[in-house]
Structure formats: C-alpha cells, structure tokens
Amino acid sequence: MSNETNCTLDFEQSVELFKEYNLFITAFLLFLTIILQYGYATRSKFIYILKMIVLWCFWPLNIAVGVISCIYPPNTGGLVAAIILTVFACLSFVGYWIQSIRLFKRCRSWWSFNPESNAVGSILLTNGQQCNFAIESVPMVLSPIIKNGVLYCEGQWLAKCEPDHLPKDIFVCTPDRRNIYRMVQKYIGDQSGNKKRFATFVYAKQSVDTGELESVATGGSSLYT
C-alpha cells in the first residue's frame, strides 16, 4: 500500500476553495485592473509608481515559479520546458538591470529603473532645477509647455517655472546614447496678453552622442550643481 498522498483537487473541492477565497480573488483582480488601466505617469504618479512595483515583482515571481517547476516537474518534457523558461526569465531580469544601471549612469535619474521603457527625458532649467520624466521612446520632436507657471512635458507635471527658465537644449537619454534636442520655436503669451499664463516650446532632435549629462554645462555650471 502506497503512503503517497494524492494532492490533486476534484471539482467540488475547487468550488469550495473558490467560495472561501472569492473575496480575496476579487479584490486582487480589481487591484491589478486599476493599476494596469490607470497606471500612467500622465494620470497619477502614485498609481504609476504602484504599477512599477507590481511589474518589478513579476520577474522574481516568474523566476521563483520557474525554479519550483524545475524541482517538481510533471514529466521529462515539462522539466525541459521549465528549464528553458526559467533561464529565459533569469536572462531577461539580468538584462533589465544591466540596461537600467547603464541608463542611470548616463542620466542619474531613478526613472532609469522604469520597467516600461529604457529612455529618460531631462530638462535642466536655467534656475538650476533638473526635471526628469519618463518617456516610452526617443521622439523626433519634444514640445514642453508652461501653463499657469507649471512646466509639463509628455503630459507630465515637472516643476514650477517661468518661460525664460527653459534652456536652449534638452535631452533624452538611453542606455547607449544621449539625444540632444535644440529649441527651434517658442510662443509666449495668450490672447489676453498675459505671458505668464501659457507658453509652448518646440525642440527638434539635433544630434546624438555617447556623452553623459554630467558633461553638459549651462552658463558655466555643471548639471548637478
């Protein structure tokens, strides 16, 4: 007689288990839905940060589940598949950290560890403020605006400033490149003639190099002074 215990659940046990934990499952799925649907930097920074934390947790969770699958494979084919998937998850996770650290060394912004993209925009205002923002890709044109004394770029709130605080050049950094954008057009004022209420600027991609933001100087001052 075998002493092994059958740990599989039949249909009735599965139904009872679901009934017991359905409230937790509902709350968890609702949490994920809200995070994934409303987690954008242009909507709510708080929810967006929660979304980033959830995405960060997925990779270690995938690796842990993959290791468990390797330890307790259903059969030989399942073991091979589990090993392949676990190795892929580990390589992807390591690759993410390598690229994020390279980007952080280039722009010194915590947005470098954003799992949704590998690019960070940087604006050094002439008053000494440094504004970094998440950006999904490297565009050909950037159009920051100032509305009621607040600077926005890519729909994200950055800082309070005046129109004359915008620099001649702004940057978008990737792990291996620094993209330089030069101001080609600006409009300051509105129909009421109040120049402090609204201003829009157009920056076109000017050049690409491999420098870091630390090498940029504006008016003789380092970016980080």
From Swiss-Prot:
| Keywords, sorted A to Z | Glycoprotein, Host Golgi apparatus, Host membrane, Membrane, Transmembrane, Transmembrane helix, Viral envelope protein, Viral matrix protein, Virion
Q: Which residues lie on this side of the membrane: Virion surface?
A: 1-20, 73-77
Where does it reside?
Virion membrane; Host Golgi apparatus membrane
Q: List membrane-spanning regions.
A: 21-41, 52-72, 78-98
Molecular functions (GO terms) = structural constituent of virion
Give ranges for the Intravirion compartment: 42-51, 99-225
Q: What does this protein do?
A: Component of the viral envelope that plays a central role in virus morphogenesis and assembly via its interactions with other viral proteins.
Subunit description: Homomultimer. Interacts with envelope E protein in the budding compartment of the host cell, which is located between endoplasmic reticulum and the Golgi complex. Forms a complex with HE and S proteins. Interacts with nucleocapsid N protein. This interaction probably participates in RNA packaging into the virus.
Which named protein is this?
A: Membrane protein
Species: Avian infectious bronchitis virus (strain D1466) (IBV)
